[in-house]
């Protein structure tokens, strides 16, 4: 009986799974091979993101294997980020790519070679802006990014203002308006420590400033 069961299992299984479907453990542990572009980017030990424009950004798992990527694949999409991709990233909006701290682009050249290009205009991990534009809806918010000057401006949906708790700032003003901050040219804000669940920053400024962080806050993630 055992022999019959074994024969039945093997004969049926081989109809659906061939020997070619089995992979050596070393290939499973390292499913992707780093390109020369990947190796060049990995020499930079700072904290940044990479945009691989040689493939579908939101269906690509290989780039995330080597770098912090602005893309990647997951069956459960983050709605807001997917909208940001559809409305802005897919259109190569450079200001949005700068805002996402995209320091390197992986692109192809005329010869079909894959190359790494450094983006000199990336905003970094965090920065101060001197203007906050308040809009009335999520639609206005995503469309405002069409013309946003991300190094000096930020956009906030009016419904999100109450999340800013500090008094005497935009949190205490219940009208839809824009807010200006007197930029301190000597002010700094920098990322000191990067852990999976905790990011530590340090800032120094003589005046009240509005900081923008190049991160997605996902409470349960």
Question: Each PLM stretch: what is its role?
Answer:
Residues 2-72, 90, 117:
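Extracytoplasmic
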Residues 19, 75-76, 84:
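Generic signal for short, ordered secondary-structure residues
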Residues 41, 72-77, 91-221:
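Flexible, solvent-exposed extracytoplasmic
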Residues 27, 79-94:
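Aromatic/His-enriched, Gly/Pro-containing loop or helix-boundary segments
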Residues 29-32, 87, 139-142:
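Juxtamembrane helix-loop transition sites at the ends of transmembrane segments
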């Amino acid at each position: 009986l055992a022999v019959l069961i074994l024969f039945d299992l093997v004969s049926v299984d081989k109809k659906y799974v061939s020997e070619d479907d089995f992979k050596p453990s070393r290939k499973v542990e390292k499913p992707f091979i780093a390109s020369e572009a990947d190796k060049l980017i990995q020499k930079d030990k700072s904290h940044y993101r990479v945009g691989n424009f040689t493939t579908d950004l939101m269906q690509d798992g290989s780039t995330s294997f080597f770098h912090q990527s602005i893309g990647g694949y997951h069956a459960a999409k983050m709605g807001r980020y997917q909208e940001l991709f559809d409305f802005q990233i897919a259109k190569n909006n450079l200001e949005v790519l700068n805002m996402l701290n995209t320091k390197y682009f992986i692109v192809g050249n005329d010869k079909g070679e894959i190359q790494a290009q450094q983006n000199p205009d990336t905003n970094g991990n965090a920065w101060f802006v001197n203007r906050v534009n308040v809009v009335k809806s999520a639609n206005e918010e995503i469309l405002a990014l069409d013309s946003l000057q991300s190094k000096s401006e930020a956009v906030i949906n009016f419904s999100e203002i109450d999340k800013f708790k500090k008094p005497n700032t935009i949190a205490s003003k219940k009208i839809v308006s824009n807010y200006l901050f007197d930029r301190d040219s000597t002010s700094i804000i920098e990322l000191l420590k990067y852990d999976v669940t905790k990011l530590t920053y340090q800032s120094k400024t003589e005046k009240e400033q509005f900081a923008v962080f190049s991160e997605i806050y996902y409470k349960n993630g």
